[in-house]
Amino acid sequence: MFQKLIVITFAIALASANIFDFLNNFNTGGRQQQNQGVRTPQEYESVVLNSQCDKYLCPDTGLCVEAPKFCPCPYPSSQIRCFLPDGRFVCISKPAGEGISEKYNDPKTNWKIDAKDDNIRDCGWVNRAWRGLV
């Protein structure tokens, strides 16, 4: 009886795995999906070298801007740009959570917000970390 139960369980597991594998192949056309945003180094180099930008070409986004400080983050819907005391900037993930994430949606003001809480990683936290206070 116990052996029959093991055999039946194994057969069900095997059938389930095959069904899910079939559905996965059916949805992707039998091939691996590729990230369309990733370029090869050669393609990236070609884009940079053939750019018609006469100012500053942002390395992360390929946008032509007046100066490096105007480069946007590569993923503006989920990142904020925090300026460092030396004039450079870093892009970090927007803080998330109930009642917190809405404050960081406006790119014109989100870099000014400091929650003054070391558990919330915003631009205020970045500046405190830069100064060694975290």
Curated annotation (Swiss-Prot):
Keywords: Signal. CDD domains: LCL2-like. Residues 1-17 form the signal peptide. The keyword Signal applies. GO terms for biological process: ERAD pathway. Belongs to the LCL2 family. This is Long chronological lifespan protein 2. The gene is LCL2.
